[in-house]
């Protein structure tokens, strides 16, 4: 797996095997698409068949720092059992799809950073990022309320850890594109409500994805009330905005269980 970087922004491009051909990931800011993606957009699609995308919802690779040495906690369990352990029972499912998406909550860093004052702050070692590709996960959403648990420095470390592990990501500033044989799927994300500024930014991202040739845009929405069966008015509003801006599919989390669908 290889990573490429664009000059003006972090632009990860991870090569992976897909049916004997190569699929690629691109991560970039809306106003700075990588040249390689623009070249790929000129290809005539020869793809036939289906693309299978799995959405796993909230995922934390670590936990509260005070529990880092707990034998039963995530950190010590992963160190003891191996980095392939967390997704072991999902391996057959995730290895059989084309794209697996998680909402990555928490920070991946090896530095001692000041935590933001809040109820829960999640973090794990930087090399925990490799848990994702070992488990068949190619894409991480970072639009949530835990990516800044250790401030901007922790967030930057998380992005770097994912890039080093060959995992693509999307957030408020970056979109992700999966490209294979002329087919392109774009991914965007949001957390909770969409302010006027956030709406403007999201529209620019979706416009950019269409301009580079994405035939499908997926929006990942982190919003709602945990353990409630029905979507909240906030979720419905954000989903409607995303569709109006160009999303073909909106996937919500983190209610912790399945909710209603609207087709």
Can you describe what each PLM-predicted range is?
Residues 24-263:
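Acidic, metal/ion-coordinating pockets
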């Amino acid at each position: 797996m290889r990573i490429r970087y664009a000059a003006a922004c972090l632009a990860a491009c991870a090569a992976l095997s897909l049916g004997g051909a190569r699929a690629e990931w691109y991560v970039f800011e809306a106003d700075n698409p990588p040249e390689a993606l623009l070249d790929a957009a000129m290809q005539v699609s020869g793809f036939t068949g289906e693309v299978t995308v799995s959405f796993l919802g909230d995922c934390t690779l670590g936990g509260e720092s005070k529990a880092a040495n707990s034998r039963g906690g995530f950190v010590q369990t992963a160190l003891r059992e191996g980095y392939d352990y967390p997704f072991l029972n999902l391996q057959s499912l995730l290895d059989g799809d084309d794209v697996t998406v998680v909402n990555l909550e928490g920070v991946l860093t090896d530095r001692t950073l000041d935590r933001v004052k809040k109820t829960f702050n999640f973090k794990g070692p930087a090399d925990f990022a490799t848990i994702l590709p070992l488990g068949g996960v190619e894409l991480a959403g970072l639009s949530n309320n835990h990516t800044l648990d250790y401030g901007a420095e922790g967030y930057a470390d998380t992005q770097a850890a994912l890039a080093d592990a060959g995992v693509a990501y999307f957030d408020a500033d970056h979109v992700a594109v999966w490209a294979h044989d002329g087919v392109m799927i774009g991914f965007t994300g949001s957390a909770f409500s969409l302010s006027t500024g956030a709406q403007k930014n999201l529209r620019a991202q979706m416009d950019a994805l269409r301009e580079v040739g994405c035939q499908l845009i997926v929006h990942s929405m982190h919003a709602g009330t945990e353990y409630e069966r029905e979507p909240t008015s906030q979720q419905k509003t954000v989903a409607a905005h995303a569709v109006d801006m160009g999303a073909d599919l909106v996937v919500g989390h983190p209610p912790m269980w399945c909710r209603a669908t609207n087709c």
